[in-house]
C-alpha cells in the first residue's frame, strides 16, 4: 500500500517501523550525515545523544543514509564515497522496511518534499481487488447457502423462502440477495425480488447487492435490481458507487444502464475521483470516451486538485491526453502543489505528451489570433494608415519623420480634409501672390514691395470700390481656370480672399517661429515666382484697360505697403479725375520711355509667367495622381472587405449545414437507442413470462401429463419427465446380439439385448452402437432403444405423452424426418419436438447467448448461439471425444507392462479413466514433475485384487483432447476449435461469446478442464478480451436438464408438432416447426 502524503498524520496514528520512530525521533540529526546541521532535529539540550543503541545504529547507517532512505536520495549530503558498500544485506533489509515510512517516521524529513513517494502519493485501489466474497460453508445458514450455490431445486427454494426471513444477515452482514447477486444466481435473485426483500441493505463494507452484482460483472442480476428500484448512488466505505465499479471493469453497457437509471456521473469517492477521473487514472480509454460523450465534467478535481488531464499525464497515457485535448480542456489548470500538466509531463520525461501539449497550445494561439482579427477593422486600419501616411508627408519635418502618427478614426473624412487643405493652400497661394500682403525683405518668401515710378501728383480714378471688385472677379476667374476640381459652386470671392489671407498669415507665423517647411506635393514658391505671377496678373488687367491710358497696373502691383491693413486687402486710394490731370512734355517723353521699358519687361514677365503656369499644371497632375492612388487603395480595401464578408457568409452556411447533419445523426442515434431499449424490454418481458410459466408448470404438472424428454447420445441415453432436476433413466446406448445361436441354453434366449443388460452379457454378445459420432446409422437398433426407454425404463405408454427428442448440431434432414416418422407412426405419440443439444445446454446455464463446447462419447461440437438460435456457419465438428480415450489409455498403459485386451478389461480401463484421470494445466511442467517425484502417482485395485500404479498416464490420456496428434489425428484441439468457431462468428457478438463459453457433456467432466480451457483460449484471444469459462457441476446431464426446462414452459405446446399437423403435412413439417 502506497503512503499518501497529502497531510501529516498525528504521531500516534503513524505506523512505527519496527519500533524505530520512538527511539530515533530525537537523535535523527545526530545519527544521519544528511541531517547534520540541518536544524531539523527535535533534540533538546537535555537529549540523550550517547545512547548505546543509537551509537550502534549510527555507526551502521552513517554511510548508507543517502541510499537507504527515499527522502535523502539525490540530496548530495551523504558521506558515502564511490567505494561505499551499498549492497550490504542488513541495509538492504532495513531499506526495504523503512522506505515507505521515511517521511512519517523521521522528523528531519517531514515536509521536506524529498521523498520519492510523490508529492501527492498514489491512490489505493484495494477497493477493486477480489470482488467476489470469500465464503465458508460453516458460516452460512440454509438460505444463504442456497443463495450462494444455487443448487437447491426451485420448489424447495420457494418453500424455504416462506419459512425464513429473506432479509436475514450473516456474520459479514450479507443477505441472501448479496450472495445470489455476487455469484450470478439470477433465478434466486428473481425469487427474492418477488418476495419484496430489502434492496439497499449494506454488508460489512457498506455495499449493496447492486454494487456486488456490478463489481462481479453479473449484468443480469444488476439489471433485475435496477428494475426493482435499487439506488445506484449509494457509496460503499471507499466512497465508490456502482458507476465507479462499472468504469473500473470497463463495462460500458452496464455504465450506460446505470446512467439510464439515474446514476450520478459526478459522484466522488474518498479520493475525490469521479467516474471519469477513475477511468483516466486506470487508463480505461474506451469508458473515458464514453463518459465524455455523456457530458461528464472534464474540469472535475480530485482531492489533490488534479484534473483529468493532469492524471492522464501522470499515468503517461498519450492516447487519453489526446482525447482530452480534443475536448478543449484547460491545459493551464494547476493542482494543489502548483504544477500544471505540462510540468508533470516534462518532469516525467513524457516527450510524446509534451509534444501534444505544445501543438495544442500553438493551435489555441492561432485560433485566438484568428478570432480577434476583424475584416471591417482591418479595412478601417488600412485606410487610416494610408491617410496618416499622406498627412505625414505634408506635416513631417525634413530631418525626422514621426514614428507614432496620429490615427484618424475615419479614413474618408481625412481624405476630404486633405483635399480641402490642398485647395485652401492653392487658393491662398494665388491670392497672396496677387495681393502683396505684408512687407518683407525677401528672405521670408514674401512678395517684395517695389518702388513706385509714378509721380507723387499722379491722379487715379475715384471709383476705387469698382477697381476692388474687378480684382476680385479677376482672381475668381483665374482660380476657376487653374483648379476647377477644388472650387465650389457657391463660393464667395470676398470670403475666399479673406480665408486665403488668413491661411497665409498662419503660414508666415509658423515660419517666424522657426518651424521647418512642409514637405507637401506642391512645389516651393520663391520670390521670383511671386513676382512673375504678380506681373502676369497685372498684364492681363492692363490689356482690358489699355484704352484708358491710366497707370493702374503699376499701382496694382506697387500699391500695397507693409503694415497697411491687417485684413490683407488692398487699401483704398484717393480719387483723381482724369479731366484735371495735366502732363508736361518732358513728362510725356518720360512716360513713353517708361512705357516702352515696361512693355519689354512685361513681355519677359509673360514668358516667365507661362513657365510658372506649366509648373502649376505639373503640380496639379501630381496631386491628382496621389488622390487617384488613394482612391484605388480604398477600392482595393473595399474589395477585400467584400470578399471576407462573402467568405464569412459561406462559412456560416457550412456551419449551419454541419449542425443540421449533427442534429440528424443525434436523432438517428436516439431512435436506435430507443429501439434497443424496446428490444431489451421485450426480451425481459419474454424471459419473465417464461420463468412464470416454468414456475406454474413446476407446481401443477405431474408425471401423468408431463412431457417425456429423451436425450440420445452416442454413448449414453438419458430419459425422464419434464420438470425434474435430473433424468430418471441413464443407460448405455448399445444393442447386443448373441454371437452364436443356442449359446445360452437352458434359458429363454432373446433376439437382442439393450442397455445395461447388454453390457452385463458383453462376453457372449456382439455389441453395437446405433449412433456413431452423433449421427444415427442403424434405425432398427435405435427403435429398440426407444422402445426400451418407454416400456422398460420409464414404464409409460408413449401414446399418452408428448415427446421431446434431442439431436446433434447439423443433423441431416433425412434423419430428422425419420425420427419424426417413427415417433408418430410406430409409437403413436400425440405430439413431439426436436431440439438442438447445444441450445439446451445453454438454457441450463441461464443464458441465451454464448458458445457451447459439447463433448460427449462420440463427437465434439462447438456451437455459437445468439438469442437462442444456433449459428450453423460458425458451428464446427471434431470427431474426437470420450470413446477414443480408453483405447489410448490402454495403449500407454502397456508401456508400464499393463495389458488390457478383452471387452471386460476395456470397461476396467474406462473406469480408470473416469476416476483417476485429470487435465494438466501445463503439460510439460507436469511431465517434469512426474519424472522427478512420485507425488502424482495413484493406485487402482483391479477386480481380482491386484493393485496397479498409474503415473503420468493420468494426464497424458485427456491431453489427447488438446493435442490430437497423440492419437495420430491431424486436426485442431478442442480449444483451437472453440476459438475458430468464435472467429467465424459476427464481430459484434464475439465479446459475448468469449465471456459466455459453456462446457457440456461427459468428456468435459475431467478435473482441471475449465482452467485449461481458460488458459488456452486466453492465449489465442486478443489480450484485452475477457475470457470466462462456465462449467456447471452437472454438465454431464446439462442437455437433458435444458430439455426439461424447455418442455416445462407453458409455451411449449405452441412449439411442438401435433399428430394432426403431421397427418396434414407429413415428416417434412419438422423443418418448419423445429428450427
Curated annotation (Swiss-Prot):
Main location, first listed in the record: cytoplasm
The region called Disordered is annotated at 369-530, 544-596
Which residue windows are transmembrane per the record?
none
Per the record, the similarity remark reads: In the N-terminal section; belongs to the POTE family. In the C-terminal section; belongs to the actin family.
UniProt-listed PANTHER family: ACTIN
Please name the Gene3D superfamilies in this protein's record: 3.30.420.40, Actin, Chain A, domain 4, Ankyrin repeat-containing domain
Kindly give any further remark recorded in the entry: Results from the insertion of a beta-actin fragment at the C-terminus in the POTEE paralog gene leading to the formation of a new functional chimeric protein. This insertion occured before the divergence of the Old World monkeys and apes.
Q: Which UniProt keywords apply?
A: ANK repeat, Coiled coil, Cytoplasm, Repeat
* Region (Actin-like) location: 702-1075
Q: Which organism is it from?
A: Homo sapiens (Human)
Q: Which GO terms describe its biological process?
A: axonogenesis; cell motility
Report each ANK repeat as a residue range. 172-201, 205-234, 238-267, 271-300, 304-333
List the biased-composition ranges (Polar residues).
Answer: 485-494
Taxonomy, superkingdom: Eukaryota
Name listed for the protein in its UniProt record: POTE ankyrin domain family member F
Q: In which tissues is it expressed?
A: Expressed in breast cancer cell lines (at protein level).
The molecular function terms in GO held by this entry are:
protein kinase binding; structural constituent of postsynaptic actin cytoskeleton
Compartment(s): Cytoplasm, Cell cortex
What do the Gene Ontology cellular component annotations say?
Answer: actin cytoskeleton; actin filament; axon; blood microparticle; cell cortex; cytoplasm; extracellular exosome; extracellular space
Name the InterPro entries for this protein: Actin (IPR004000), Actin/actin-like_CS (IPR020902), Actin_CS (IPR004001), Ankyrin_rpt (IPR002110), Ankyrin_rpt-contain_sf (IPR036770), ATPase_NBD (IPR043129), CC144C-like_CC_dom (IPR039497)
Q: Where does the record place Basic and acidic residues bias?
A: 377-392, 401-424, 466-483, 495-530
Q: Is the Transferase keyword given for this protein?
A: no
Amino acid at each position: 500500500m502506497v503512503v499518501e502524503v497529502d497531510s501529516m498524520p498525528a504521531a500516534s496514528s503513524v505506523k512505527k517501523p519496527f519500533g524505530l520512530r520512538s527511539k530515533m525521533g530525537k537523535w535523527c540529526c545526530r545519527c544521519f550525515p544528511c541531517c547534520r546541521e540541518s536544524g531539523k532535529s527535535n533534540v533538546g539540550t537535555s537529549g540523550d545523544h550517547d545512547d548505546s543503541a543509537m551509537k550502534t545504529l549510527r555507526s551502521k547507517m552513517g554511510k548508507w543514509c543517502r541510499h537507504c532512505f527515499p527522502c535523502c536520495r539525490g540530496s548530495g549530503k551523504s558521506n558515502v564515497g564511490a567505494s561505499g558498500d551499498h549492497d550490504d544485506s542488513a541495509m538492504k533489509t532495513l531499506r526495504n522496511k523503512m522506505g515507505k515510512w521515511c517521511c512519517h517516521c523521521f522528523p528531519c524529513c517531514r515536509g521536506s518534499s524529498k521523498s520519492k513517494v510523490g508529492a501527492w502519493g498514489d491512490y489505493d485501489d484495494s477497493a477493486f481487488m477480489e470482488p467476489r466474497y470469500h465464503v465458508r460453508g460453516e458460516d452460512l445458514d440454509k438460505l444463504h447457502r442456497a443463495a450462494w450455490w444455487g443448487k437447491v431445486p426451485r420448489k424447495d427454494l420457494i418453500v424455504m423462502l416462506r419459512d425464513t426471513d429473506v432479509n436475514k444477515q450473516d456474520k459479514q452482514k450479507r443477505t441472501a440477495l448479496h450472495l445470489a447477486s455476487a455469484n450470478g444466481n439470477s433465478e434466486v435473485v428473481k425469487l427474492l425480488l418477488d418476495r419484496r426483500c430489502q434492496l439497499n441493505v449494506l454488508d460489512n463494507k457498506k455495499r449493496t447487492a447492486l454494487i456486488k452484482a456490478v463489481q462481479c460483472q453479473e449484468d443480469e442480476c444488476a439489471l433485475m435490481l435496477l428494475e426493482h428500484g435499487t439506488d445506484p448512488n449509494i457509496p460503499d466505505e471507499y466512497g465508490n458507487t456502482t458507476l465507479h465499479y462499472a468504469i473500473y471493469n470497463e463495462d460500458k453497457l452496464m455504465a450506460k444502464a446505470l446512467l439510464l437509471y439515474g446514476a450520478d456521473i459526478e459522484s466522488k469517492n474518498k479520493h475525490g475521483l469521479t467516474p471519469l477521473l477513475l477511468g483516466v487514472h486506470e487508463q480505461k480509454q474506451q469508458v473515458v470516451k464514453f463518459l465524455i460523450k455523456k457530458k461528464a465534467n472534464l474540469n472535475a478535481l480530485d482531492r489533490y486538485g488534479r484534473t483529468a488531464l493532469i492524471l492522464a499525464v501522470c499515468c503517461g497515457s498519450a492516447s487519453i491526453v489526446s482525447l482530452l485535448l480534443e475536448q478543449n480542456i484547460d491545459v493551464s489548470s494547476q493542482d494543489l502543489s502548483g504544477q500544471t500538466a505540462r510540468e508533470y509531463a516534462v518532469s516525467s520525461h513524457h516527450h510524446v505528451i509534451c509534444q501534444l501539449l505544445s501543438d495544442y497550445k500553438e493551435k489555441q494561439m492561432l485560433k485566438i489570433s484568428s478570432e480577434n482579427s476583424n475584416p471591417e477593422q482591418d479595412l478601417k486600419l488600412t485606410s487610416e494608415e494610408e491617410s496618416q501616411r499622406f498627412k505625414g508627408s505634408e506635416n513631417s519635418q525634413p530631418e525626422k519623420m514621426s514614428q507614432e502618427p496620429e490615427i484618424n478614426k475615419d479614413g474618408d473624412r481625412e481624405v476630404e480634409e486633405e483635399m480641402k487643405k490642398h485647395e485652401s493652400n492653392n487658393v491662398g497661394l494665388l491670392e497672396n501672390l496677387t495681393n502683396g500682403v505684408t512687407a518683407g525683405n525677401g528672405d521670408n518668401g514674401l512678395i517684395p514691395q517695389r518702388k513706385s515710378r509714378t509721380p507723387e501728383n499722379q491722379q487715379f480714378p475715384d471709383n476705387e470700390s469698382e477697381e476692388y471688385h474687378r480684382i476680385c472677379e479677376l482672381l475668381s476667374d483665374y482660380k476657376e481656370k487653374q483648379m476647377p476640381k477644388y472650387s465650389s459652386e457657391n463660393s464667395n470671392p470676398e470670403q475666399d480672399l479673406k480665408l486665403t489671407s488668413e491661411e497665409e498669415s498662419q503660414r508666415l507665423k509658423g515660419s517666424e517661429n522657426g518651424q521647418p517647411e512642409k514637405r507637401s506635393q506642391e512645389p516651393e514658391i520663391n520670390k521670383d515666382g511671386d513676382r512673375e505671377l504678380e506681373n502676369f496678373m497685372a498684364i492681363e488687367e492692363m490689356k482690358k484697360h489699355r484704352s484708358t491710358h491710366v497707370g493702374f497696373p503699376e499701382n496694382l502691383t506697387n500699391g500695397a505697403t507693409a503694415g497697411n491693413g491687417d485684413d490683407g486687402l488692398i487699401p483704398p486710394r484717393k480719387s483723381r479725375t482724369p479731366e484735371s490731370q495735366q502732363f508736361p512734355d518732358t513728362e510725356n517723353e518720360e512716360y513713353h520711355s517708361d512705357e516702352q521699358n515696361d512693355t519689354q519687361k512685361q513681355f519677359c514677365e509673360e514668358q516667365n509667367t507661362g513657365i510658372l503656369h506649366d509648373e502649376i499644371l505639373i503640380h496639379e497632375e501630381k496631386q491628382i495622381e496621389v488622390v487617384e492612388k488613394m482612391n484605388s487603395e480604398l477600392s482595393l480595401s473595399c474589395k477585400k472587405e467584400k470578399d471576407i464578408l462573402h467568405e464569412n457568409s459561406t462559412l456560416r452556411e457550412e456551419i449551419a449545414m454541419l449542425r443540421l447533419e449533427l442534429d440528424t445523426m443525434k436523432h438517428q442515434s436516439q431512435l436506435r437507442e430507443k429501439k434497443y431499449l424496446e428490444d431489451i424490454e421485450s426480451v425481459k418481458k419474454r424471459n419473465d413470462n417464461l420463468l412464470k410459466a416454468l414456475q406454474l408448470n413446476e407446481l401443477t404438472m405431474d408425471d401423468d401429463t408431463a412431457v417425456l424428454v429423451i436425450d440420445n447420445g452416442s454413448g449414453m441415453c438419458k430419459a425422464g419427465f419434464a420438470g425434474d432436476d435430473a433424468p430418471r433413466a441413464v443407460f448405455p446406448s448399445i444393442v447386443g446380439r448373441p454371437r452364436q445361436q443356442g449359446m445360452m441354453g437352458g434359458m429363454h434366449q432373446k433376439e437382442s439385448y439393450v442397455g445395461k443388460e447388454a453390457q452385463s452379457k458383453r462376453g457372449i454378445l456382439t455389441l453395437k452402437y446405433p449412433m456413431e459420432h452423433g449421427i444415427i446409422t442403424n434405425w432398427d437398433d435405435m427403435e429398440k432403444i426407444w422402445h426400451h426407454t418407454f416400456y422398460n425404463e420409464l414404464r409409460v405408454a408413449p401414446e399418452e405423452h408428448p415427446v421431446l427428442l434431442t439431436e446433434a448440431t447439423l443433423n441431416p434432414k433425412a434423419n430428422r424426418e425419420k425420427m419424426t416418422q417413427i415417433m408418430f407412426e410406430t409409437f403413436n405419440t400425440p405430439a413431439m419436438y426436436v431440439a438442438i443439444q447445444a441450445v439446451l445446454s445453454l438454457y441450463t446455464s441461464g443464458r441465451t447467448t454464448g458458445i457451447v463446447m459439447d463433448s460427449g462419447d462420440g463427437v465434439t461440437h462447438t456451437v455459437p448461439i445468439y438469442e437462442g438460435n444456433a449459428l450453423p456457419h460458425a458451428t464446427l465438428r471434431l470427431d474426437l471425444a470420450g470413446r477414443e480415450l480408453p483405447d489410448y489409455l490402454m495403449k500407454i498403459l502397456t508401456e508400464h507392462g499393463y495389458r488390457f485386451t478383452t471387452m471386460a478389461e476395456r470397461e476396467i480401463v474406462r473406469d480408470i479413466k473416469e476416476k483417476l484421470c485429470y487435465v494438466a494445466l501445463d503439460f510439460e511442467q507436469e511431465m517434469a514433475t512426474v519424472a522427478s517425484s512420485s507425488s502424482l502417482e495413484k493406485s487402482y485395485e483391479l477386480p481380482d485384487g491386484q493393485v496397479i500404479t498409474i503415473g503420468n498416464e493420468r494426464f497424458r490420456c485427456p491431453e489427447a483432447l488438446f493435442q490430437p496428434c497423440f492419437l495420430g489425428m491431424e486436426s485442431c484441439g478442442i480449444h483451437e476449435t472453440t476459438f475458430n468457431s468464435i472467429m467465424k462468428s459476427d464481430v459484434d457478438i464475439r465479446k459475448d461469446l468469449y465471456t459466455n463459453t459453456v462446457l457440456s457433456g461427459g468428456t468435459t467432466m475431467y478435473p482441471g478442464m475449465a482452467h485449461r480451457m481458460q488458459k488456452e483460449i486466453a492465449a489465442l484471444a486478443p489480450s484485452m478480451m475477457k475470457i470466462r469459462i462456465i462449467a456447471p457441476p452437472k454438465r454431464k446431464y446439462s442437455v437433458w436438464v435444458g430439455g426439461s426446462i424447455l418442455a416445462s414452459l407453458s409455451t411449449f405446446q405452441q412449439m411442438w408438432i401435433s399428430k394432426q399437423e403431421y397427418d396434414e403435412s407429413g415428416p417434412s413439417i419438422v423443418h418448419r416447426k423445429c428450427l
